[in-house]
């Protein structure tokens, strides 16, 4: 029950092709591929954008002095 032979998968593939058609499956594959590519490009852009921003933030706060006065409780 847990293992399927190659014939099971071929029958499932045939049913999917008959139900959806090859054009629809090709469009789904193209859309999925472009979505994955867009995700990878976005992750790459996010990785390059965050590194300089972190360095700039640290430099701007290092030159400032903050004075704080505390009040006793009670």
From Swiss-Prot:
GO molecular function, one term: protein transmembrane transporter activity
Pfam families reported in the protein's UniProt record: TatA_B_E (PF02416)
Record key words, sorted: Cell inner membrane, Cell membrane, Membrane, Protein transport, Translocation, Transmembrane, Transmembrane helix, Transport
GO biological process terms, semicolon-separated: protein transport by the Tat complex
Compositionally skewed regions (Polar residues) per UniProt: 56-68
Keyword Zinc-finger attached: no
Signal peptide: none
Family classification: Belongs to the TatA/E family.
Protein function: Part of the twin-arginine translocation (Tat) system that transports large folded proteins containing a characteristic twin-arginine motif in their signal peptide across membranes. TatA could form the protein-conducting channel of the Tat system.
Matching NCBIfam families: PRK02958.1 (NF002813), tatAE (TIGR01411)
Protein name, UniProt field: Sec-independent protein translocase protein TatA
């Amino acid at each position: 029950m847990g293992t399927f032979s190659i014939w099971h998968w071929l029958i499932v593939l045939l049913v999917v092709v008959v139900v959806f058609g090859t054009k629809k499956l090709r469009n789904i594959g193209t859309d999925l591929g472009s979505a994955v590519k867009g995700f990878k490009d976005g992750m790459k852009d996010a990785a390059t954008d965050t590194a300089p921003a972190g360095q700039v933030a640290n430099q701007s706060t290092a030159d400032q002095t903050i004075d704080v006065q505390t009040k006793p409780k009670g």
